[in-house]
């Protein structure tokens, strides 16, 4: 059993990021030399000063006002927490951490996102954040999915509703295996 309530620590950290939108309060939930890496874009920071700069000028308060996170699952270990969620927003602002350099398109985005968070001494030590960047780029109109195995918003819908069809991107390959012995 973890020494600290990792879920409570993580939720306090997220409140500072998304509700109070306070970079100093966010940093106070972290170890002295933390790091955050949004893997698809390599956005974040290493060490207190670089990460505080990232939070203050490129993350906190820069997210679209309608951004919501729908929890899907949470796994808690002795020093780590893994959150699976769906992130929904309308692309009305420049989102440096997810879509660096891309001006607002006004389009809606729904994407599964996974946060892997490590804790040390009752504080957040680091975060690794993953999502399918191709699906995001398709949804904002920057990538044509024609002929590519990219699910777009359908991936988020499938996470929320496992009864939705699987293998839709397999096309003829999936149809060709129909009726074969299993």
Predicted regions and their residues:
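C-terminal and inter-domain tail/linker signature
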Residues: 1-182
């Amino acid at each position: 059993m973890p020494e600290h309530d990792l879920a409570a620590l993580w939720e306090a950290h997220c409140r500072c990021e998304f509700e109070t939108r306070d970079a100093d309060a966010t940093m106070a939930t972290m170890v002295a030399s933390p790091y955050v890496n949004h893997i698809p874009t390599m956005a974040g920071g290493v060490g207190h000063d670089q990460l505080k700069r990232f939070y203050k000028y490129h993350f906190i308060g820069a997210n679209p006002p309608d951004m919501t996170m729908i929890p899907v699952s949470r796994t808690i270990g002795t020093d780590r927490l893994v959150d699976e969620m769906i992130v929904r927003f309308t692309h009305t602002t420049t989102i440096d951490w997810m879509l660096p350099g891309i001006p607002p398109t006004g389009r809606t985005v729904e994407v599964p996102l996974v946060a892997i968070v490590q804790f040390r001494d009752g504080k957040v030590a680091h975060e690794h954040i993953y999502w399918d960047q191709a699906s995001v780029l398709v949804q904002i109109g920057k990538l044509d999915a024609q002929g590519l195995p990219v699910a777009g918003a359908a991936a988020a819908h499938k996470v929320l509703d496992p009864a939705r069809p699987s293998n839709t991107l397999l096309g003829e390959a999936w149809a060709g295996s129909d009726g074969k012995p299993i």
